[in-house]
Amino acid sequence: MTLRIFDTGTRTLRDFKPVQPGHASVYLCGATPQSSPHIGHVRSAVAFDILRRWLMAKGLDVAFVRNVTDIDDKILTKASENGRPWWEWVSTYEREFTWTYNTLGVLPPSTEPRATGHVTQMIKYMQRLIDNGFAYAVDGSVYFDVAAWSKAEGSDYGSLSGNRVEDMEQGEPDNFGKRGPQDFALWKAAKPGEPSWPTPWGDGRPGWHLECSAMATYYLGEQFDIHCGGLDLQFPHHENEIAQAHAAGDKFANYWMHNHWVTMAGEKMSKSLGNVLAVPEMLKQVRPVELRYYLGSAHYRSVLEYSESALSEAAVGYRRIESFLERVGDVEVGEWTPGFEVAMDEDIAVPKALAEIHNAVREGNAALDKGDREAAEKLASSVRAMTGVLGFDPVEWGSDAGADGKADKALDVLISSELERRATARAEKNWAVADEVRDRLADAGIEVVDTADGATWKLQ
């Protein structure tokens, strides 16, 4: 089957045809390590980790680049406010992001370039834009000339976001000498006390948009397959990346993919609103694999509304899968179901893929109850294949757990097995058995909590 991707640039589902057959090249806008990561940040990493895993599962050799924006206005401001060197501030939070990615099972990128390590590439990029007539230098800063580019043959400025040029204003704070309000900084002239690098136009530091265009094309070439990022980056960041690249003569990305926000009480999760949830705090409620399951469970283009009940229900869903595989015992990874492949090939439709997994779990448990171990093992092998693609194969996660984690896991599996028995009894209206399971767990200090999506448990 052919993978189809919703391309933000054309607002259509398109067949994925890689630039180089047998290979896939992907660029993901990564972290700006100005503060601790929250689940809004991490959703993007998990969503496109699933994309990457599916491309790999289809036999493609994937070059996956995820950058680090290690210099920008917010970093400098926060470091200064806290009396710390900017590079030390960045290093602290970059380590937190790396820990978070690793903890949630996000595969390491093929390359993780930092902006400050690619000033040479940025200088060359600016020179090309100036030579082509689409950038200009003023008092040590370099700006992209939006008016000149928007009038040029082949210009598509505004097409990604749907904005009109006349309605755009970049809001650059350092706008002295700009020819137009839409123009944005490629390079910012040095200020006292700030880090700077030498260029032919004066010392300074890179603009945000220039960094990604220069690094993406340096590592993936002037034309590559997929550019990913959060929906909030669509404008101005990604719109300006496209403008720079096309004005420089590069074809740039063939497909654009954007994940939607994590919201709380209907509002986008953001530091400015004070409604962010740091990953370590979340991990006090659920295990890392359960948080990954939750973050990846919604379609990447859908809003993920956070609530404690939604997180608990996701954990219950994962534990059902885990409990089934524990019942079956050791099985090798098999083949995914045809329905799973259809779901993943249709714009990475994880909710439909999860439905395939849970159908297989239900059928497998039924087979075990009937004594058909061969059928159960075949289904378990399929479940392992499907959960592996999504990055939460319970067997793989279990093998990576420490002693404490294994003890917790064993306890959880035992209780989940009892909850499955109770659920079966309730479905058969065998209330005596259902009550017996509940009471026995209560005697052990475990409270059963019934939710719309099944039962979970907590210590009394």
From Swiss-Prot:
GO CC annotation, single: cytosol
Residues that coordinate or bind Zn(2+): 29, 212, 237, 241
GO molecular function: ATP binding; cysteine-tRNA ligase activity; zinc ion binding
Record keywords, A-Z: Aminoacyl-tRNA synthetase, ATP-binding, Cytoplasm, Ligase, Metal-binding, Nucleotide-binding, Protein biosynthesis, Zinc
UniProt keyword Nucleotide-binding present: yes
Entry-linked SMART domains: DALR_2
Family: Belongs to the class-I aminoacyl-tRNA synthetase family.
Catalytic reaction equation(s): tRNA(Cys) + L-cysteine + ATP = L-cysteinyl-tRNA(Cys) + AMP + diphosphate
Main location: cytoplasm
Biological-process GO terms, alphabetical: cysteinyl-tRNA aminoacylation
Motif ('KMSKS' region): 268-272
Domain of life, source organism: Bacteria
Entry's localization field: Cytoplasm
Motif 'HIGH' region: chain residues: 31-41
Binding residue positions for ATP: 271
UniProt organism field: Corynebacterium glutamicum (strain ATCC 13032 / DSM 20300 / JCM 1318 / BCRC 11384 / CCUG 27702 / LMG 3730 / NBRC 12168 / NCIMB 10025 / NRRL B-2784 / 534)
Cysteine pairs bridged by disulfides in the record: none
Protein name according to UniProt: Cysteine--tRNA ligase
Cofactor-binding details, from the entry: Binds 1 zinc ion per subunit.
Cofactor: Zn(2+)
Subunit (UniProt): Monomer.
The protein's enzyme class: ligase
